[in-house]
Regions:
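Short alpha-helical transmembrane segments in multi-pass integral membrane proteins
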Residues: 1-21, 79-146, 188-244, 300-365, ...
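N-terminal transmembrane alpha-helices
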Residues: 8-45, 59-74, 78, 103-110, ...
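Transmembrane helical elements of multi-pass membrane transporters/channels
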Residues: 19-38, 140, 151, 174, ...
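Helix-terminus/linker motif at the lipid-water interface of multi-pass membrane proteins
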Residues: 33-51, 121-128, 184-191, 251-284, ...
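Small-residue hotspots at the loop-to-helix junctions and early N-terminal turns
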Residues: 46-59, 134, 138, 197, ...
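Small-residue-rich hydrophobic transmembrane alpha-helices
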Residues: 51-111, 148-167, 261, 274-338, ...
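Hydrophobic transmembrane alpha-helices of multi-pass small-molecule transporters
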Residues: 63, 178-182, 208-212, 284-287, ...
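Short runs within selected transmembrane alpha-helices of multi-pass transporters and secretion channels
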Residues: 72, 141-159, 167-175, 196-211, ...
């Protein structure tokens, strides 16, 4: 194996986690910028109706892309563990099985989006004036789902072995292409909503092509060889065992947010448009924090596989500290400069005022989510995904739905709606931390047994 294994299993952890997480954060931001540029371009050059149409799809986009990201998280953990343990043949089997699993998942979601968009948007009570544009946007956007699944697969593999720079470079290229195509399709071709969706789909294909090509050129056990592509039954079972709960976990948040979006849609179109603009801040801040969650899972999994229990626990606490700090700083900045941020997406002062109602509640709440998400990532790094998913279902999905139909139904104000985020994060975090403490002790016993035998 190459020496880049040392990136995760040797050296000062605080520095190494930061260096691995920084490109991940930038990569995540670029993925968010794909959708943000869609919103910004249509808001500026195609009008507020087009802005509302694109924004009203954000929950559904998050639902399905979240599932793919969760699936790739399972791939990341498995590759990292085998790579840390120097089980080269297992790494090879995981990479080639994961590529096929990812492609299948992307194709399935493609057809779900093409056929189910009208039903899902009506289920969200999407406004009649926004519905045609929203359906068109989703159907064109979902053409890029197989490519997005394959990009996330490649990103998971590179991140698992500590190389987060290549995904960043490829996303930078795709991001620049996305912005250029957005401007061309909307301003020059006057394609409005269809144009920005098409730009996103093309850009996703570009990023997937670049990262897959890079995987075929590496000189290590995680190289992608098209001749070796097959579904190894045992490996596929492990990938799905880790990835499906993680993907479902991500989807659960989006499902719960469907009820929140329905709550937003119960207000006038002005509030819907303001919410669409403000939601971009959520994505930016959350995805910056999420970089440390992926790093946490990778570092814990590799060090667990390498038999270094002392670095396993430290990886969790360092990642938690970083993600909490990022959430606090970025959330506070949004609270102070929210109007300037929202002006990037709309020139209508009434829409900005509406968006600030969300910012006012969420600004200092993001950091709370670090305790929940980083702990979930830590449990995943130890191979535990089922129980954390159950906790998320209860603490986030069920709790939020109950909140919408009780507290929000009673007050019916924007603050009463968005207050459920920090409350559900805190509740779920408490349960996740208790579970992680238990499974950590259980997982560390494997390192104590040889000493007891001596």
């Amino acid at each position: 194996m190459k020496s880049n294994t040392k990136t995760l299993t040797e050296g000062p952890l605080a520095k190494q986690i930061f260096l691995v997480s920084l490109p991940l954060a930038l990569s995540n931001l670029l993925q968010v910028l794909f959708n943000m540029s869609d919103v910004a371009v249509v808001g500026r050059f195609a009008g507020s109706t087009a802005l509302g149409a694109v924004g009203s799809t954000s929950i559904l986009v998050s639902l399905f892309t979240g599932f793919l990201i969760g699936l790739s998280g399972g791939i990341n953990v498995l590759v990292a563990r085998f790579y840390g343990a120097r089980h080269e043949h297992d790494v090879e089997k995981t990479v080639h099985s994961a590529a096929i699993v990812s492609l299948i998942a992307g194709v399935v979601l493609l057809f779900v989006g093409l056929l189910g968009s009208p039903f899902m948007l009506r289920l969200l009570n999407t406004k009649d004036d926004l519905l045609p544009g929203a359906i068109l946007y989703l159907r064109v956007y979902f053409l890029g789902m197989p490519a997005l699944a394959l990009y996330n697969f490649g990103n998971a593999v590179f991140s698992a072995i500590g190389d987060t720079k290549k995904p960043l470079m490829y996303l930078s290229i795709a991001g620049a292409l996305n912005i250029a195509l957005n401007l061309f399709f909307v301003i020059v071709c006057q394609l409005s909503v269809m144009g920005v969706a098409l730009a996103s789909a093309i850009s996703q294909c570009a990023s997937a092509g670049l990262i897959l090509h890079a995987l075929t050129k590496v000189q290590d056990c995680y190289v992608l060889d098209t001749k070796k592509l097959h579904l190894d039954p045992a490996t596929t079972k492990s990938i799905l065992g880790l990835g499906i709960p993680a993907g479902f976990q991500n989807a659960i948040f989006a499902i719960a947010n469907l009820f929140i979006q329905a709550g937003v849609n119960s207000f006038d179109s002005l509030m819907v448009k303001g919410n669409s603009a403000a939601a971009n801040a959520d994505a930016m801040i959350y995805d910056c924090m999420a970089a440390f969650y992926m790093a946490c899972a990778s570092f814990m999994s590799q060090n667990y596989g390498a038999g270094k229990p002392d670095r396993v626990k430290k990886s969790y606490f360092i990642s938690l500290a970083y993600s909490f700090g990022v959430g606090l700083i970025l959330g506070g900045s949004l609270f102070l400069f929210g109007r300037t941020f929202l002006a990037l997406f709309t020139t209508e002062s009434a829409v900005i005022d509406a968006g600030m109602k969300r910012v006012g509640v969420m600004g200092f709440a993001y950091c709370i989510s670090a305790f929940m998400d980083c702990t979930i990532a830590a449990s995943r790094g130890l191979g535990k995904t089922v129980v954390p998913t159950i906790i998320v279902v209860m603490g986030s999905c069920v709790f939020r739905v109950i909140w919408v139909y009780t507290i929000f139904a009673h007050f019916h104000t924007i603050p009463s709606l968005y207050a459920l985020y920090p409350c559900s994060w805190a509740l779920t975090a408490l349960a996740e931390i208790v579970y992680f403490a238990h499974c950590y002790k259980e997982s560390m016993r494997i390192f104590e047994q040889p000493k007891a035998a001596a």
